[in-house]
Amino acid sequence: MQRFGTGSSRSWCGRAGTATIAAVLLASGALTGLPPAYAISPPTIDPGALPPDGPPGPLAPMKQNAYCTEVGVLPGTDFQLQPKYMEMLNLNEAWQFGRGDGVKVAVIDTGVTPHPRLPRLIPGGDYVMAGGDGLSDCDAHGTLVASMIAAVPANGAVPLPSVPRRPVTIPTTETPPPPQTVTLSPVPPQTVTVIPAPPPEEGVPPGAPVPGPEPPPAPGPQPPAVDRGGGTVTVPSYSGGRKIAPIDNPRNPHPSAPSPALGPPPDAFSGIAPGVEIISIRQSSQAFGLKDPYTGDEDPQTAQKIDNVETMARAIVHAANMGASVINISDVMCMSARNVIDQRALGAAVHYAAVDKDAVIVAAAGDGSKKDCKQNPIFDPLQPDDPRAWNAVTTVVTPSWFHDYVLTVGAVDANGQPLSKMSIAGPWVSISAPGTDVVGLSPRDDGLINAIDGPDNSLLVPAGTSFSAAIVSGVAALVRAKFPELSAYQIINRLIHTARPPARGVDNQVGYGVVDPVAALTWDVPKGPAEPPKQLSAPLVVPQPPAPRDMVPIWVAAGGLAGALLIGGAVFGTATLMRRSRKQQ
């Protein structure tokens, strides 16, 4: 028995020692090849951090560092064919129930350039350049987003009104060319020398007319010279993985003047909710940066992110105060889960807009082509207690991760398949929408575009969650117009409960499914709670406790009672002793 006990003790000690060594190795990182996991929790809200709503403007002086983005049209494009995403969403049937009339949609993006097919465009302010009104789009992004939400159709019969459009700006780092001085010299006198005509050639009789030059060709239309244009087309998106195809299309260098028409040529493009008003707020631009980026203790990139978070918070508050009932944020920010910057102001802003101002906030899930936007895990079957994989998040997307107050949109193709390499997954993704085959209004003229200029004479095709969010914002506006009695949170509830769900019911790529405008407008869906669950980080303000009760009378009474008991006990004890003493005598 003793030997058996000793062996068992040694075996237990050996197992304990092995476990200890393994724990030390894991803690020290000696076992490599394990993916990093940053356990994060859903963000909380501090309402006291709400930023003020003053006149829009940048936090620090800004300047333009790059040329504005030019736009184009892919070869072989026929705008008379309806974009695939419009056919997928069955918008013609959805429009039987309304077009979003009376709803204000704020577009917090790179600005929106005025266009004849955006007749209800409202300037909302500029957080990029001081004194701006939000109606300049150097990046050719915000105009695309706004047009997918609210562009009116063109039937070719009604002329569209002309709108003023500002000229494209140029980088402020360039110095203007030096003034040129032109000196005119007098023309020297010319000497004319007359040369006698040569004698007639042999064989020509004297007095016969000398043959002149050949007559010019008869007047009339001539076939124009053909210029074969060359270049390349980049297919998937603005940046990231690219598939480049050559362009070889004949161009006429002398096109004939177009015949006058009543209106622009008809096309099949329209915004999701062509009856809404658009509030344009320019909050970001890749062409602009801080005039002096090397001030303060932070590195320039971190400082820019901090400023972007602050201006986004202020833009959300400003949009809500301007009466927007839908707020679209397609230009989101990504950051590592290891280094999440302070977002108390942004959290307070989305809470204020969604709860206090009853606005539906729609945000993009983020695109893998953008800086710091690394893909998150989708699902870990070994963690059944964490079905949305919060503990596996490596990239935080803001303001998208404020999922209780923001409807975050992932991207799918025209067949409903997730764009897994482009759309950033996350536990905050609630719904999805098409993000390909993008068509929109041009920020440079009165036409349509489906591409932007890229490097090396290439065209980049817009795609991604930015445009998926625009589609959902348009559908949210349709639902708000159809059900004005519903709160913002109830509108979100209706959208996600009428979406076309994935196989698991909900996942981190498409959320609860692909948005379905017709179902959202027609299905019988319970309203649900009017407000989202509260996730407050600041302590609640509780009423002051009542004044403490005056205990002096109680203690006096208790002391008197105790004294009486003592006296009574003494008297009783004395009487008992006297009785015993008498008995003994």
From Swiss-Prot:
User: What enzyme class is recorded for this protein?
Assistant: hydrolase
Q: Which UniProt keywords apply?
A: Cell membrane, Hydrolase, Membrane, Protease, Serine protease, Signal, Transmembrane, Transmembrane helix
Q: What's a GO cellular component annotated to this UniProt protein? A: plasma membrane
Which InterPro entries has this protein been placed in? Peptidase_S8/S53_dom, Peptidase_S8/S53_dom_sf, Peptidase_S8_Asp-AS, Peptidase_S8_subtilisin-rel, T7SS_pept_S8A_mycosin
Q: Name one GO biological process term.
A: protein processing
Which portions of the chain have biased composition (kind: Pro residues)? 196-224, 252-267
Q: Where is this region: Disordered?
A: 163-269
Q: Where is the composition biased (Low complexity)?
A: 163-173
Q: Membrane-crossing residues? A: 552-572
Annotated active site = D109 (charge relay system), H141 (charge relay system), S466 (charge relay system)
Alphabetized PANTHER family for the sequence? NEUROENDOCRINE CONVERTASE 1, PROPROTEIN CONVERTASE SUBTILISIN/KEXIN-RELATED
Q: What is this protein called?
A: Mycosin-5
Species the sequence originates in: Mycobacterium tuberculosis (strain ATCC 25618 / H37Rv)
